[in-house]
């Protein structure tokens, strides 16, 4: 991705995962690659939304349409963004996010320890509807 497409590394979990942003993007990451076993593979793709309201609204809509929550909603400490992940039927996950840190061209990638605390400041494990009493349209 870096050599062939021009993605830039934003941050990393050394030897474990890489946060990459597309050419011209100032979002913290558009793609996250995670090493699992002996392979490096696709973990998730991120879709940037305008604000936390769209993350929650979109997340509730996806839930109503039968998409299974992987994790979220929640907030990442590395990018400061709000998130909601959905299991992708083809593998990996799709992430709705908003309010990510603005990454300048002079950004220097940082190395982080991989831990639950570095992944999420807070998060719901099964989506917000379960905890809030929100009607999702399912009976």
Residue ranges and their predicted role:
Residues 27-29, 44, 75-77:
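Histidine-centered active-site/metal-ligand motif
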Residues 47-94, 98-106, 110-139:
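Vicinal oxygen chelate
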Residues 1-28:
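Core segments of cupin and vicinal oxygen chelate
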Residues 10-12, 34, 85-87:
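Well-ordered beta-strand positions
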Residues 25-31, 91-92:
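Short, charged/polar, Gly/Pro-enriched secondary-structure boundary elements
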Residues 16-18, 43, 80-84:
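Short beta-strand micro-motifs in enzyme catalytic cores
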Residues 28-42:
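Solvent-exposed, charged amphipathic helical/linker segments at domain boundaries
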């Amino acid at each position: 991705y870096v050599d062939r497409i021009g993605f830039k590394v934003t941050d990393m979990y050394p030897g474990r995962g890489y946060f990459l942003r597309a050419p011209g993007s100032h979002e913290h990451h558009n793609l996250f690659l995670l090493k699992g076993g002996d392979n490096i593979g696709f973990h998730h793709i991120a879709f940037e939304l305008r604000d936390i309201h769209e993350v929650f609204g979109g997340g509730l809509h996806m839930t109503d349409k039968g998409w299974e929550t992987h994790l979220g909603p929640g907030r990442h400490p590395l990018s400061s963004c709000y998130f909601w992940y959905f299991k992708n039927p083809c593998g990996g996950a799709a992430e709705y996010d908003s309010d990510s840190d603005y990454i300048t061209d002079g950004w220097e990638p940082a190395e982080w320890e991989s831990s639950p605390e570095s992944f999420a400041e807070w998060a719901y494990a099964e989506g917000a509807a379960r905890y809030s009493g929100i009607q999702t349209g399912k009976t």
